């Protein structure tokens, strides 16, 4: 388990033009859901391109513990599901490691079953708030038998004999909360409705519909989305090809923009409009990103991205864009560090409850490496240095956060002095091939003894 491994420092240094073609691992959001819905569906589900990072593998283990048969052969995962309403009570606690998505979605999935389920996680996950998911489940009849103060892990849930459908307005822009309520609705009689004032990533609705769930989506005159699911229906196994994760593609993409003389092609990247906030922002900053071979795969938009080094200019990123790029702010802050002028990022409160307090971790890493930035309650302002002059030379504390580690290793590729991170081991949670893919493009990244 990654949270018991010794730390492994790494260092990156100024690199010459990055060149080559690459594929990033499968999308994390879709991978978690493909395993969950396949494990719940009747019949067989086959998945290719699954992200085989630690977080997703924890979801596979959880579904196995509740009765799904899951096998991997030659890169294809085959699942024989239990059928909707037929999950088995797990004998041991479900250990989700560092996986926020896996743990929160599974709480929704099991919360309306008449059984007891215990959730545990690593030190980082155990600091993250789970009340946002538990509150709607309580309304549906779920009992929280045990939790740490502030509704934190470890948590024990007991589902009701008869769950109650609810209409739930999500209090913050969170695809995980929306998804947890919809998954709880799968095993609840009647119609469960989630109302989201701001649209968040919509993989749950799209994929559940693809598996045969009765889902209706309407937008009211205020622009809020009402997503309704008819409970206790049948899900049928599917064949799924998982596209590349845009949140992982963000790292080589920004590296190519800021390392002079770079020209790379990132193939098969998910371009779902609820996930493309970073690309839109970088294009506003002057990034040369060309979308090639645009196509649809399994109901999702996919494209190849040709990225060439670019002179970037600072912009203001509106709060309304945060849900479509919540995982990309660390790497956007790195791009802003090499841009001319000031970049202002608004509406970042959600970053305070990620794998780390991601907002303060980013600001701290920028400052120790000579970057002029100001951290507000929910804002970050970065004043860039286009040539990377005087930047680097420090070690960044990653706080067990994979995206902090990757973002600052990218910073070092365009800084005057090397940048170190205190630990790279947790990169395996989302992007196990990161080091190999980056060095394959010509990035100077190495283990540091």
From Swiss-Prot:
Residues annotated as binding 3-phosphoshikimate: 28-29, 33, 174, 176, 327, 354
Its EC number(s): 2.5.1.19
Disulfide-bonded cysteines: none
Function noted in UniProt: Catalyzes the transfer of the enolpyruvyl moiety of phosphoenolpyruvate (PEP) to the 5-hydroxyl of shikimate-3-phosphate (S3P) to produce enolpyruvyl shikimate-3-phosphate and inorganic phosphate.
Swiss-Prot/TrEMBL GO biological process terms: amino acid biosynthetic process; aromatic amino acid family biosynthetic process; chorismate biosynthetic process
Residues engaged in binding phosphoenolpyruvate: 28, 100, 128, 176, 358, 403
SUPFAM superfamilies named in the record: EPT/RTPC-like
Annotated active site: 327 (proton acceptor)
Name this protein carries in UniProt: 3-phosphoshikimate 1-carboxyvinyltransferase
Naturally occurring in which organism (per UniProt): Chelativorans sp. (strain BNC1)
InterPro entries (alphabetical): Enolpyruvate_Tfrase_dom (IPR001986), Enolpyruvate_Tfrase_sf (IPR036968), EPSP_synthase (IPR006264), EPSP_synthase_CS (IPR023193), RNA3'P_cycl/enolpyr_Trfase_a/b (IPR013792)
Lineage, top ranks: Bacteria, Pseudomonadati, Pseudomonadota, Alphaproteobacteria, Hyphomicrobiales
Chief location of this protein within or outside the cell: cytoplasm
Name of the gene this protein is made from: aroA
PANTHER family per UniProt: AROM/DEHYDROQUINATE SYNTHASE, PENTAFUNCTIONAL AROM POLYPEPTIDE
């Amino acid at each position: 388990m990654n949270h018991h491994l010794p730390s492994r420092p790494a260092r990156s240094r100024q690199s010459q033009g990055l060149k080559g073609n690459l594929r990033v691992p499968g999308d994390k959001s879709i991978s978690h859901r493909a395993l969950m819905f396949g494990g719940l569906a009747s019949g067989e589900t086959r998945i290719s391109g699954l992200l085989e990072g630690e977080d997703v593998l924890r979801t596979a283990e959880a579904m196995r513990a509740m009765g799904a048969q899951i096998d991997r052969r030659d890169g294809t995962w085959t699942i024989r599901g239990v059928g909707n309403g037929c999950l088995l009570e797990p004998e041991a606690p479900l250990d989700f490691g560092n996986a926020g998505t896996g743990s929160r979605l599974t709480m929704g999935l099991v919360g309306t079953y008449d059984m007891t389920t215990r959730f545990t996680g690593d030190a980082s996950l155990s600091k993250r708030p789970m009340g946002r998911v538990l509150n709607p489940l309580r309304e549906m009849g779920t009992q929280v038998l045990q939790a740490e103060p502030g509704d934190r892990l470890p948590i024990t849930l007991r589902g009701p004999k008869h769950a109650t459908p609810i209409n739930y307005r999500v209090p913050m822009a969170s695809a995980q909360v929306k998804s947890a309520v919809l998954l709880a609705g799968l095993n609840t009689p009647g119609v469960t409705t989630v109302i989201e004032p701001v649209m968040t990533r919509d993989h749950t609705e799209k994929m559940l519909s693809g598996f045969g769930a009765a889902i209706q989506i309407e937008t009211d005159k205020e622009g809020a989305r009402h997503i309704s699911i008819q409970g206790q229906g049948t899900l049928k196994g599917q064949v799924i090809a998982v596209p590349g994760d845009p949140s992982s593609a963000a790292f080589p993409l920004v590296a190519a923009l800021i390392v002079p003389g770079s020209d790379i092609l990132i193939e098969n990247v998910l371009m779902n409009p609820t996930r493309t906030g970073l690309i839109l922002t970088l294009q506003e900053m002057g990034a040369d990103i060309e979308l090639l071979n645009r196509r649809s795969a399994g109901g999702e938009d996919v494209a190849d991205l040709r990225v060439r080094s670019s002179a970037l200019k600072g912009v203001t990123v509106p709060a309304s864009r945060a849900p479509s790029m919540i995982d990309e702010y660390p790497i956007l802050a790195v791009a802003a560090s090499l841009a001319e002028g000031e970049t202002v990022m608004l509406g970042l409160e959600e970053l305070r409850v990620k794998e780390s307090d991601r907002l303060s971790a980013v600001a701290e890493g920028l400052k120790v490496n000579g970057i002029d930035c100001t951290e507000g309650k929910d804002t970050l302002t970065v004043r860039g240095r286009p040539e990377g002059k005087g930047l680097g030379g420090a070690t960044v504390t990653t706080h067990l956060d994979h995206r902090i580690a990757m973002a600052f290793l990218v910073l070092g590729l365009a800084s005057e002095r090397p940048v170190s991170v205190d630990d790279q081991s947790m990169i395996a949670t989302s992007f196990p091939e990161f080091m190999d893919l980056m060095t394959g493009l010509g990035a100077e990244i190495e283990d540091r003894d």
